[in-house]
């Protein structure tokens, strides 16, 4: 099998999905991300994604293993007008 390295440019929900994919894929190589899911990305989860010595520790909770803190989500609505999907340093208007 060819090894896979899922690339992640989204937040912690997609991160949790990639972690679950990685744990059940025998040809998984590395989990690639542009973020560490800290700050707001940790606050929006009731239990943040856990890291130890550079490794993600998969959740033992059911499903994706995460639960959103909806109070945090409501307190931080998305108000921007652009979606940053490129490797540019600044958001695109």
Which role does the model predict for each range below?
Residues 1-63:
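Shared catalytic-loop signature of beta/alpha-barrel
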Residues 64-93:
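Extended hydrophobic packing segments that form well-structured cores
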